Amino acid sequence: MTACSTAIRAQQLLLPVLSALGLLAAGAPQPPNIVLLLMDDMGWGDLGVYGEPSRETPNLDRMAAEGMLFPSFYSANPLCSPSRAALLTGRLPIRNGFYTTNAHARNAYTPQEIMGGIPNSEHLLPELLKKAGYTNKIVGKWHLGHRPQFHPLKHGFDEWFGSPNCHFGPYDNKVKPNIPVYRDWEMVGRFYEEFPINLKTGEANLTQLYLQEALDFIRTQHARQSPFFLYWAIDATHAPVYASKQFLGTSLRGRYGDAVREIDDSVGKILSLLQNLGISKNTFVFFTSDNGAALISAPKEGGSNGPFLCGKQTTFEGGMREPAIAWWPGHIAAGQVSHQLGSIMDLFTTSLSLAGLKPPSDRVIDGLDLLPTMLQGHIIDRPIFYYRGNTLMAVTLGQYKAHLWTWTNSWEEFRQGIDFCPGQNVSGVTTHTQEEHTELPLIFHLGRDPGERFPLRFTSNEYQDALSRTTQVIQQHQKSLVPGQPQLNVCNQAVMNWAPPGCEKLGKCLTPPESVPEKCFWAH
């Protein structure tokens, strides 16, 4: 099925869905609220509903029991920033510019010194939702650029409590400043200063602060009778892993498990508030993660990717297959499991559909509208593309995944103890040199072999059939692809968070060094 026919088919499926919701009729009711819960480095196997044996996620498991579980839901990239850019634009990072051309097949993101960020030419989800009267808030990690022009309130959000990057540090504020925490336009402190994180004990109150921001926003918008979009993008399971005092030491899985338990408790409180306010039937909630669990973290500080190979930074299943739950009481029937191949980019198009809006017609949108899947059980045929930088590494079509390139990380890093596939290395598959397979891709049947350990024999009829179908999809994709201007090539220490807006009031302004733009170095 071509991309064009897939889009037409999706629209045909969507029309009766929108009619049923009353969104196409004159005088349609207020569109539903939208809550996207995006975790940071949480793995597919971290939830009880996906088989995690300690069963420490009762609220998320209940959310799945009351909604729809997606076992085959994917990130658009195995790293934070490109994945988030894809969610908010509905477009692959190769299209929206969140990639690097500094080296072949390199993952890149937005550290403090990055010059680039989300381009003004991209239409972000909150910008479009404003057209339908939504009030939009981001809580947590932005990660789409540090410079003033990339501020989330310049890209459709009305409120922000969080940071432009993760809680890395502590830094010395001389060579590198601590990351600021913002309330709307101005910083209100920095990580490890006004917002402490105890690296020895793992204690930090950040998740509780993020939770309270979400609850207060929901209550306020409910009182205003205004449709709202809440993008709750907390960073609790990203290393260094932290949890609040009341959750530390409560999990069988160590500090990482403590963080997961606190997240689960927070999600439960958000869902309970929606129910107690009587707005759960008019609020669509989706839970997922930005990429797979980071398996290189310290002992008991990394998550689980279940049966899948490797983790964050790789384009094996463990790096890009995510936990995903849709919840919308009264609309999504309880207890469903969908085998639709889903993507984080689908949240863009689905959210627009919920608001009664169409995606921009002047560009390619990679995200599909999943309402026909969630409300009527339809399965839409589509490929999943796995990129690393500007390199197409693999594609999944149906149950078959074809690897065009394989690489985990360099031998140099591996010998230093950096292993993205600890205890899982597969000969000829998890390679420490970049191996090209474009002529004869490694093809796996993910239904029989989710761990990507046994590639199909090149001479088998099954391989030849899968090769023919995936080759057609790859050629069509590459022929029509117009890459965006790469945003992650140039770094400059002078653009770090030395003197963010609001630093004067706090006495937190630091002196930036001389401006020296240079090529960013991306190791893997």
From Swiss-Prot:
Its EC number is 3.1.6.4. It catalyses: Hydrolysis of the 6-sulfate groups of the N-acetyl-D-galactosamine 6-sulfate units of chondroitin sulfate and of the D-galactose 6-sulfate units of keratan sulfate. Its main location: other. Pfam families: Sulfatase, Sulfatase_C. Glycans are attached at N205, N425. It comes from the Eukaryota. GO terms for molecular function: arylsulfatase activity; metal ion binding; N-acetylgalactosamine-6-sulfatase activity; sulfuric ester hydrolase activity. This is N-acetylgalactosamine-6-sulfatase. The gene is Galns.
